[in-house]
A protein has these predicted regions:
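Hydrophobic ligand-binding cavity/cleft-lining segments
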Residues: 1-42
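Short beta-strand micro-motifs in enzyme catalytic cores
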Residues: 2, 45-47, 90, 102
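Hydrophobic pocket/interface hotspot
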Residues: 16-21, 27, 47-49, 65, ...
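Juxtamembrane/interface motifs at transmembrane-helix termini
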Residues: 36-40, 49, 95-96, 123-126
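Short aromatic-glycine motifs in intrinsically disordered, low-complexity regions
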Residues: 50-54
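A conserved amphipathic terminal alpha-helix motif
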Residues: 103, 109-145
Length: 145
């Protein structure tokens, strides 16, 4: 299993950050990586997610929301067409660090033998996309505050 982690401090309340993260209909406005999410922020919901790759191509994923704790944690998990090849779980956790600041812990967990094949390239691409998304999210959240 491989875990790729990132975090960012936001000058915002948890409720504002949560509202923006779970408003999937506006991802296309602010998110350079996840350009569309079709579905609702509900436990068990199967989403259709469009992701722009580093090379500018669009990939479609269909993960399911596996955890939803309001103002705290959102997770979705997807599987490849080939069982056991590559599974990914996107994790967003908010921590209130002070009255005016919140930390977003943003990570991706990968499992399956595809992680061996993709290896270093997978890690670099995902690290880059997490950072791009974090920076865009910070800009959006702090603009709303």
């Amino acid at each position: 299993m491989k875990e790729i982690r990132s975090e960012i401090e936001l000058h915002s309340s948890v409720s504002t950050a949560w509202k923006i993260l779970t408003d999937f209909s506006t991802f296309h406005v602010w998110n350079p990586v996840i350009t569309q999410i079709i579905g609702e922020a509900c436990l068990g919901e199967r989403l259709k997610i469009s992701v722009r790759t580093k090379k500018g191509k669009t990939r479609i994923y269909r993960p399911t929301i596996t955890k939803l704790e309001e103002n705290h944690e959102l997770r979705w998990k997807g599987k490849s067409f080939i069982p056991g090849f590559l599974n990914g779980e996107r994790i967003f956790i908010f921590q209130q660090t002070s009255r005016d600041y919140v930390r977003l812990l943003h990570s991706e967990l990968f499992s399956g033998f595809g992680t061996i094949i993709a290896g270093h390239r997978l890690i670099e691409d995902v690290e880059s996309s997490l950072q791009q998304m974090n920076n865009a999210f910070k800009k959006r959240v702090e603009h709303e505050t």
